[in-house]
Amino acid sequence: MKVSVAALAVLLIAICYQTSAAPVGSDPPTSCCFTYISRQLPFSFVADYYETNSQCPHAGVVFITRKGREVCANPENDWVQDYMNKLELN
């Protein structure tokens, strides 16, 4: 009986430790852009996009190509803004 109570106590402590290890509401960035594509992608290659997390060191737009590749682009470029607007309308 003492073994099972001890095991239960250790398990409970481990669970409590895991839940308190990360601050509440922390959302680590899943992908960040550290370099941008140097040329404009053909719009016909682009299937979707998402913006990088605000916790990333640099703002970025990640275009997902029709082949499933992810390409980082500078959100300050005019063509990037144009593609984002076109994709939002579809």
Curated annotation (Swiss-Prot):
Primary localization: secreted
Signal peptide span: 1-21
Keywords, sorted A to Z: Chemotaxis, Cytokine, Disulfide bond, Secreted, Signal
Localization terms from the record: Secreted
Any one Gene Ontology BP term: chemokine-mediated signaling pathway
InterPro entries from the UniProt entry: Chemokine_b/g/d, Chemokine_CC_CS, Chemokine_IL8-like_dom, Interleukin_8-like_sf
GO MF: CCR chemokine receptor binding; chemokine activity
CC annotations in GO: extracellular space
Cysteines joined through disulfide linkages: 32-56, 33-72
Quaternary structure and partners: Homodimer.
Function: Monokine with inflammatory and chemokinetic properties.
Family: Belongs to the intercrine beta (chemokine CC) family.
The protein's name: C-C motif chemokine 4 homolog
Origin species: Gallus gallus
